[in-house]
Regions:
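A general structural signal for well-ordered secondary-structure junctions
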Residues: 37-38, 272
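Short, Lys/Arg-enriched N-terminal segments with co-localized hydrophobic residues
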Residues: 6-17
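Extended, intrinsically disordered, low-complexity segments
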Residues: 16-21, 28, 248-290
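Alpha/beta enzyme core
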Residues: 22-31, 38-97, 106-219, 223, ...
């Protein structure tokens, strides 16, 4: 089913009144322009999206890994059509602005990045991120000039939309085993000039490195938290100038961790004490009521 059709059929199921896409696009951009940092959590299905909306979060972001795990696949194996249908389902679940993990634009060419932005808009999204590394194992980042061309093409596609779409450009050095801060900064500066609205270098773990990135660019910076060994609070991140904090697949992996602990308890001990940590049936049902 095409994302736009899925969105149209699912719209009535949304939790709360729906804003128009231009209104959501403007609201999402406003979050990046106000004082302080905000958290944009990453649901992996309509149910978790509605729970996060119920808890009062102001915007959501998809997680490619979290979604892949939910359908029994490793990260990086979901195609563009399925990704867009999934994004449309997240959009339709609530009235919140949604930004998507668009991987590398599902192709190496600048035209692939541009086309993915157009499809993201059709799916109801008001933001999306483009990575600078191929969707192949053990890949190095694209050569800088090619990476710039890809961001520039995506930014041009954004400018051709009829509403505000927030484009995030990602520098993947640290996630592909190349922890080069200078090259990361050089790339983010280039992506800024190519038209990115938000800059993001996942994998930065120290406050000093994050601060160095922020001081080197003049666009809002996203960081990812929820990584093991990284204990920086929202207040600490806001104090050094971070604007947006996502959590990637960590909510999904946290839920899967609880699932596996419960399953192993049953298998290994034949006991069911895990139930004491479960949310009550009444509480979870109430959260899903319109």
């Amino acid at each position: 089913m095409a994302p736009s059709v899925f969105l149209q059929r699912s719209q009535e199921k949304a939790d709360g009144p729906m804003s128009t896409q231009p209104e959501k696009g403007q609201a999402f951009r406003a979050l990046h322009e106000r004082e302080g940092a905000f958290i944009i959590p990453n649901p992996w299905d309509a149910g978790t999206a509605r729970l996060l909306a119920h808890l009062g979060f102001e915007a959501l972001a998809t997680t490619s890994a979290g979604y892949a795990f939910s359908v029994g696949q490793p990260d990086g194996t979901i195609g563009r059509d399925e990704t867009m249908a999934h994004a449309a389902a997240i959009v339709a679940a609530t009235g919140l602005p949604v930004s998507a993990d668009l991987e590398n634009g599902f192709g190496d060419a600048p035209a692939n990045a541009a086309e993915t932005i157009k499809l993201a808009a059709q799916a109801g999204l008001v933001g999306g991120s483009i990575e600078d590394v191929p969707r192949r194992e053990d890949s190095a980042p694209y050569e800088l000039e090619h990476a710039i061309d890809r961001v520039r093409a995506a930014a041009e596609a954004v400018r051709n939309l009829s509403f505000r779409f927030t484009l995030t450009a990602r520098a993947e050095n640290y996630l592909v085993g190349r922890p080069d801060l200078n090259d990361t900064i050089r790339r983010l500066q280039a992506y800024q000039e190519a038209g990115a609205d938000v800059l993001y270098a996942p994998g930065l773990t120290s406050k000093d490195d994050i601060a160095a990135v922020i001081s080197s660019v003049d666009r809002p910076v996203n960081v990812v938290m929820g990584l093991q060994g990284v204990q920086l609070s929202l207040a600490e991140l806001s104090a050094i100038g971070v604007k947006r904090v996502s959590v990637g697949s960590s909510l999904s992996r946290s839920a899967l961790g609880a699932f596996l602990r419960a399953a192993r308890e049953m298998r290994d001990h034949g006991t069911f004490s895990f139930a004491s940590e479960a949310v009550s049936f009444r509480d979870i049902s109430a959260m899903f009521k319109p």
